[in-house]
């Protein structure tokens, strides 16, 4: 068993070797909770949910931490504009995010810390950096890290000299170098938020928050704090570069052995961004598409590639997922056997190669085709049915798809009001059959069929699905 992942530092695929045998520590940057989550958040969550599932399937004990940034300029701005307390805003959007992730089939992280819960550790790290002369406090009370003190600055992103980009993000006349970044922001008055600290009233910089939460919940002794740090490629610089820098300077070790980054989601070729006004919120998408279909669509492009949102491609993904559920419906419930060795080998070959989803889904498609052919030849062979159920269970465990009952899957897209009308007609049809009014029963079946609804009579009653 060898898993290869693309390491952003080495800029190539490398063999994953854990810091401790049989264990994986994984940290993924979570959202800044000032608004609902968009498809960019969803894609990142799905990408590293797949990584976690693969590691767990391979027998690793994964300790997965994903944070919430609950203090930030954007949150403060929203509070000032709306008059709503910051705590109420962040609580609402944390709940909203978790609801969205649940509908997308994302496994909950082991720990979901909030930045404000780790202020004491942030202070310790900042104090250490000040004592070492790596950080400095300005007359206004802001504290910056002096990046010239870190010879390795820029190693992660390859953009250590990108002065224009850094100064645009965080400019200040009091910086010694435009690349210096804030560890602590002094309190600026009533339009700001402040916490009492050893350095005066203020609040943490964005980057120090993640370093502190990693130290608190995941860090191990040794050359690296954790195995894998992951997130969107938009975070590579300056956020991840600055995280790596401050941890290296404060602790004397590297933050992560491996860094992984997923590609952007674009709309009409532009990166999805709330600031650009082109965010496609997950909640908006879920009003139109089932969460599992959306998951499968976002999963179907390799995680490092950009994904330009396309309704046509999404519908193609649904048809592909339909095939899986039609096979699941065909074999029905029953004994779950061991999966086909050939199928499992091909599936894992793809996923072990930096989560090559194209190869993995090709293995899935071949399995679906072969399974249907074998069922055509031997429709009642129980051993075959058990193997197919085993194959489907593997897809559920690894890819997070196929967990629904086929009936529920094929009912998606029907509104609650429509469902109620369909159930009423099914009840009326049952009463007509009981009264031997078969003409009326057939009339109801045909009426529903004309609306795209197929009826399935079973020993336990009549079921229905969208045809």
Swiss-Prot record:
This is Cysteine--tRNA ligase. Disulfide bonds: none annotated. Its cofactor is Zn(2+). ATP binds at residue 274. GO terms for biological process: cysteinyl-tRNA aminoacylation. Monomer. SUPFAM superfamilies: Anticodon-binding domain of a subclass of class I aminoacyl-tRNA synthetases (SSF47323), Nucleotidylyl transferase (SSF52374). GO terms for molecular function: ATP binding; cysteine-tRNA ligase activity; zinc ion binding. Residues 155-174 are annotated as: Disordered. Zn(2+) binds at residues 29, 210, 239, 243. Its main location: cytoplasm. Coiled coil: none annotated. Keywords: Aminoacyl-tRNA synthetase, ATP-binding, Cytoplasm, Ligase, Metal-binding, Nucleotide-binding, Protein biosynthesis, Zinc. A motif ('KMSKS' region) lies at residues 271-275. InterPro entries: Cys-tRNA-ligase, Cys-tRNA/MSH_ligase, CysS_C, Rossmann-like_a/b/a_fold, tRNA-synt_1_cat_dom, tRNAsynth_Ia_anticodon-bd. Binds 1 zinc ion per subunit. Belongs to the class-I aminoacyl-tRNA synthetase family. A motif ('HIGH' region) lies at residues 31-41. NCBIfam families: cysS. It comes from the Bacteria. It is found in: Cytoplasm. It is an enzyme of class 6 (ligase). One of its GO terms (cellular component) is cytosol. Its EC number is 6.1.1.16.
